[in-house]
Structures are given as structure tokens and as C-alpha cells.
Regions:
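Short, exposed beta-strand/loop patches in secreted or surface proteins that constitute
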Residues: 180-185, 207-208, 257-264, 284, ...
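N-terminal leader/targeting segments and the immediate start of mature chains
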Residues: 108-159
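Short, hydrophobic/aromatic-rich segments at coil-to-beta transitions
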Residues: 154-161, 185-193, 215, 263-272, ...
Length: 362
């Protein structure tokens, strides 16, 4: 809104130059040529506002031109317009952050590069058949039929968009988040990019899982790295997350030979997923309709700072099943740590979009 307001204020210089209105706030004379520059500056700021609303990543380039032109006009009319420098300075900060975010070293561009090098034209995937799922427990077979996986192409990858909320720690306030992720299943990989802000300061994060190695990075203002977690606890935890995503968002991938199944009762199965030398176990709970309604694992580790890790039970209760181009998935989930002090629900996710078997980056 500051950008829009600043843009509209520049119309005053244009109006005074062409005598469209009496501007008592502007005591210095403004030529018609200068008035045209005030108009151009106004248009630039309004364009920046619209580009930002439309989530066009190049908005900051137009903003640089607008700020430079605006500040030159302010200097020429310093006595009347000097306070515009404050607004230009306020707009400059997010421009700098956006510029840093456009550098190859930004988490957003690392995420994009990692995904792009794994996307390629793929052969036509065969449809999932009843024969493919006959080795699965009856409950899992019912789940795959319920989700519409049978008769559709097997899943090699997917792209997912979330909106939701997260907490840093127990008792903290919820933060609004937006995220995007790509998962790959021919060669296991998961890339999860998240954006949010705290006290008005933007930050972003990247979970990267390739092979069986995981890292988590968080940067403030795309510049200051505050978390860089890695190690065996991260590797184990993100193996759980990769399998959780498979169960929730890519049921067709549950025919994977690296999963061992055990029917516990009519609505519960135990699954052990192995990726090279890492094995994790989870309990999957279903309802009578065939929906997966909870995923519970004891193999995930909690950390507030990416340095100290604690092993707690982790669960993701699920609901809100909806159809996406013939595939039905849960669109609402929570992530809960079961700590000695009690349950800590630290994330709530709403699925906004999901696509399967992509060949190009979106």
C-alpha cells in the first residue's frame, strides 16, 4: 500500500505542472516537462504495486527505476518534497531483499535449480493396475482404489502448493506460510521451499533431501542464514517425511519395492520404508471409507535451532479429501510432535494445487 500511496502522491506534481488543480503543498514552480516526469514516476510506482500483487518476480527492477526517478524529482523540489525520501527508503528495503532473492545463491534459486535438473521428458508411464497392488495389505489396496490411483499413470514425481500456518516452538504464535515442493520417486528426492515473515521481516527456508541425505536452511531477508541443519537426525527425519508425502500425496507410489507391509488390524497397517541404509517405520490408520486419516512414526527428530535434536513421536492427522483431476487426496493436515510436556501441533497445511508427472518446471 505504501508503494501505491507514493505513486498517487506523485500525481500532485503532474497536476500542478498542467494546472489541473491548485496544489498549495507545492510552493515551487514545476515545468510541464518536469510534470511529465512526475506522471511517469507515478505510473512506475503503480505498475510496481500491480506486479507485486500479481506475484511477478521482476517487480523490483521497475521499483529501482521508480525510486531513482522519484528521488531525483524530490531533490529538485527538496523544500516541498523532502519527506518523500522517507517513503523511497521504506520501499528500497524490500527491493534490496528481492534483489538478493534473485541471486543464484538465494534459497529460491537453489530450489529451482535442483528441481530443474531432475525434470526431463519422460517415457509414457504405464497405468497402475490391480495386478500391481495385489501384494499390498487389503487396507492399502482399498486406499489406492478410493484415491482413484487404479487405471491412472504411475507416479514418477509431483508438484504441490500449500498455504498454512506454523509455530517455531510450543506457546509461540502462528505464522502464515506459503510453500511449494517437488518430490521424485525414481531416484528419491524432495525439495520443499517455504516463505513467511516474522514481525514484518521476511524469511524463507529450504528442505533438501537427495539420495538419503537431508539439509534444512533458513534465511532471514534472503541474506542471513539462521539455521543450517544436517546430519544423521536430519537424514532419518526427512526419510520419514518423504514416506509420509508418498502415503498422503502419491498413493500410486506405495507399490514401491522398498516398503514392507504388515496388517495390524482392519484399519491399521505398519509400514517399513528403506532407502539404502536408512529404514523408518510408520503406523498408518484408515477409516471405513478407505481414507488415510493418520500417519504416526517414532523415527523423526525435533529441533528448534537445527543443532540440538530430540526424538519424539510424530503424527499427521488428515482430513478434507478432494479430487484433483481424478486423484483424490487429503487437502488438510496437521503436523504434531508428541513431547513429554504434551502434544505440540506446529503446522497446519491446506493443499491448494497438486500436479503429477511433470516434465517442466512451473
Amino acid at each position: 500500500m505504501i508503494v501505491l500511496l507514493h505513486g498517487l502522491i506523485h500525481l500532485m506534481g503532474f497536476a500542478k505542472a498542467f494546472h489541473f488543480a491548485e496544489m498549495s503543498q507545492l510552493t515551487q514552480p514545476i515545468s510541464k516537462m518536469s510534470g511529465i516526469l512526475w506522471l511517469i514516476t507515478s505510473i512506475l510506482f503503480i505498475t510496481v504495486f500491480l506486479l507485486f500483487l500479481l506475484k511477478q518476480n521482476y517487480w523490483w527492477i521497475i521499483a529501482v527505476a521508480a525510486i531513482l526517478l522519484s528521488q531525483s524529482l524530490i531533490v529538485q523540489n527538496w523544500r516541498d518534497a523532502k519527506f518523500g525520501t522517507i517513503l523511497n527508503s521504506a520501499i528500497l528495503l524490500p527491493v534490496i531483499i528481492a534483489f538478493i532473492g534473485a541471486l543464484p545463491s538465494s534459497l529460491a534459486n537453489i530450489y529451482k535449480a535442483e528441481v530443474q535438473k531432475r525434470l526431463a521428458p519422460m517415457y509414457t508411464l504405464p497405468d497402475l493396475t490391480e495386478t500391481d497392488i495385489k501384494h499390498l495389505p487389503d487396507t492399502v489396496q482399498k486406499y489406492l482404489r478410493y484415491t482413484g490411483a487404479i487405471g491412472k499413470p504411475k507416479v514418477n514425481n509431483f508438484r504441490l502448493e500449500f498455504r498454512g500456518e506454523m509455530k517455531q516452538k510450543m506457546g509461540a504464535k502462528w505464522m502464515n506460510i506459503s510453500s511449494e515442493q517437488y518430490n521424485f520417486y525414481d531416484d528419491y528426492a524432495r525439495f520443499f521451499y517455504i516463505k513467511s515473515s516474522l514481525y514484518g521481516i521476511p524469511f524463507d527456508g529450504l528442505h533438501k533431501y537427495v539420495g538419503n541425505k537431508a539439509t534444512m536452511q533458513i534465511k532471514v531477508a534472503s541474506l542471513f542464514e539462521v539455521v543450517h541443519a544436517k546430519g544423521k537426525e536430519m537424514d532419518l527425519s526427512d526419510t520419514v517425511t518423504l514416506f509420509n508425502d508418498m502415503c498422503v500425496f502419491a498413493p500410486a507410489a506405495l507399490i514401491d519395492k522398498n516398503i514392507q507391509w504388515e496388517q495390524v488390524d482392519p484399519l491399521t497397517v505398519k509400514a517399513t520404508f528403506t532407502n539404502t541404509d536408512i529404514s523408518i517405520t510408520a503406523m498408518l490408520t484408515f477409516n471405513e471409507k478407505g481414507e488415510l486419516i493418520n500417519f504416526i512414526s517414532d523415527d523423526r527428530y525435533y529441533s528448534e535451532n537445527g543443532e540440538k535434536f530430540m526424538n519424539y513421536k510424530w503424527s499427521t492427522p488428515l482430513s478434507g479429501y478432494k479430487d484433483f483431476n481424478g486423484r483424490k487426496i487429503s487437502t488438510y493436515g496437521e503436523a504434531i510432535w508428541h513431547t513429554p510436556e504434551g502434544e505440540f501441533a506446529y503446522a497446519r497445511f491446506d493443499v491448494k494445487e497438486i500436479e503429477y508427472n511433470l516434465e517442466d518446471y512451473k
